[in-house]
């Protein structure tokens, strides 16, 4: 498999937040981080009460797709090496990718509004 592209939805062993285990999950490629590493964002079928979770539907894919409507969780990011990527499930439309990036900017900008920073 070749290197993934920004906007690809890949399948990867995604770690639980306590790093005790991992589960095969789709993840969105947000950026190339150099040396074969990529910044990824978790995609899950459950919203988990996450106020930042963006809905992901079949119509949000330019090509390919995933089995069910899901959520992109902008607060669940991690860096993974290309060797961990098990495959590419699809590629998002430009408009959906733009929505995700805009939301990430909002999430990260919120810390600048905090007087303790």
Spans of features found by a protein language model:
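Small/flexible residues
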Residues: 26-27, 75
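C-terminal terminal-subdomain/extension
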Residues: 63-117
């Amino acid at each position: 498999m070749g290197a993934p592209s920004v906007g690809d939805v890949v399948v990867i062993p995604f770690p639980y937040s306590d790093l005790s285990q991992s589960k095969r999950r789709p993840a969105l490629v947000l950026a190339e981080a150099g040396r074969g590493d990529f910044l990824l964002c978790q995609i899950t079928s459950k919203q988990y009460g996450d106020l930042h979770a963006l809905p992901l539907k079949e119509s949000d894919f330019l090509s390919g797709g995933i089995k069910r409507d899901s959520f992109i969780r902008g607060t669940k990011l991690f860096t993974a090496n290309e060797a961990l990527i098990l495959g590419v499930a699809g590629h998002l439309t430009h408009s959906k990718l733009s929505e995700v990036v805009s939301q990430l900017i909002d999430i990260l900008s919120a810390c600048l509004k905090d007087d303790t920073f």
